């Protein structure tokens, strides 16, 4: 058996999320179908760096999987995966990794980006690739709110009720909002890990602050109280992208 690491991108619009689910179309299931073909039709179970929800996209999700036999030509393997998976999945890179390397448990940091269209009328061409908010937003208020998210905090107040993780302390290295033009914003979050729906809950809260329906100090209240009820709504999934998963260097195999 040989272990491989792959970097993939996908349009999450028509998926019920990344992780396999019964009677649902998922990214994991589509890739595993192709991996099985490339593995003499023996089942292959891949592991991802984490899940993404239905409608959420990825520029740089990372997975690992094992295939029978010796190491294969990496470009041929990448090409085979890329051309046999559906059009809404792209396999960008395949690498060899040690047998004990794990996409989820290896130390890493993640970067998420969130794209928001802020205009009176919504563009029909962006309905699957950006979130939309039609009411006025104050850029300076949103900048102030984002700055308060940087650092090590207990993010219980920003996670959804379905989270099964006990330790909800995470470190955010970068929380930035960029005004791309008059009608478009990009949120950037880089950290050592994120809780279930944490990024979308933070974005929803910052949007509410930008709309002057919450004070900037609400961020402090959410962090100290650990109460989800003090935060804003969960932002829509279509604006969210897993941009990059960055690992410590792998030793030569």
UniProtKB/Swiss-Prot annotation:
The keyword tRNA processing applies. GO terms for biological process: tRNA pseudouridine synthesis. It comes from the Bacteria. InterPro entries: PsdUridine_synth_cat_dom_sf, PsdUridine_synth_TruA, PsdUridine_synth_TruA_a/b_dom, PsdUridine_synth_TruA_C, TruA/RsuA/RluB/E/F_N. Its EC number is 5.4.99.12. Substrate binds at residue 112. It is an enzyme of class 5 (isomerase). Homodimer. This is tRNA pseudouridine synthase A. It comes from Lactococcus lactis subsp. cremoris (strain SK11).
């Amino acid at each position: 058996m040989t272990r491989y690491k792959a970097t993939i991108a996908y349009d999450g619009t028509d998926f019920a999320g990344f992780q396999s689910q019964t009677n649902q179309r998922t990214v994991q299931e589509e890739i595993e179908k192709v991996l099985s073909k490339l593995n003499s039709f023996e089942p292959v179970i891949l592991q991802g760096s984490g899940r993404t929800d239905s409608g959420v996209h990825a520029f740089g999700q990372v997975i690992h999987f094992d295939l029978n036999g010796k190491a294969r030509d990496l470009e041929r393997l990448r090409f085979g995966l890329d051309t046999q998976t559906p059009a809404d999945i792209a396999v960008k890179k395949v690498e060899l990794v040690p047998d004990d390397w794990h996409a989820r448990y290896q130390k890493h940091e993640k970067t998420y980006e969130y794209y928001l269209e802020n205009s009176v009328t919504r563009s029909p061409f962006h309905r699957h690739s950006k979130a939309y908010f039609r009411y006025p937003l104050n850029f300076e208020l949103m900048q102030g709110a984002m700055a308060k998210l940087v650092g090590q905090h207990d993010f219980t107040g920003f996670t959804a009720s379905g989270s099964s993780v006990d330790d909800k302390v995470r470190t955010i290295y970068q929380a930035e909002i960029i005004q791309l033009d008059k009608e478009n914003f990009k949120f950037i979050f880089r950290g050592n890990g994120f809780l279930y729906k944490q990024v979308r809950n933070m974005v929803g809260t910052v949007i509410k602050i930008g709309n002057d329906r919450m004070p900037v100090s609400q961020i402090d209240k959410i962090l100290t109280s650990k109460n989800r009820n003090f935060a804003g709504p969960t932002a829509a999934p279509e604006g969210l992208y897993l941009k990059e998963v960055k690992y410590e260097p792998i030793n030569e195999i």
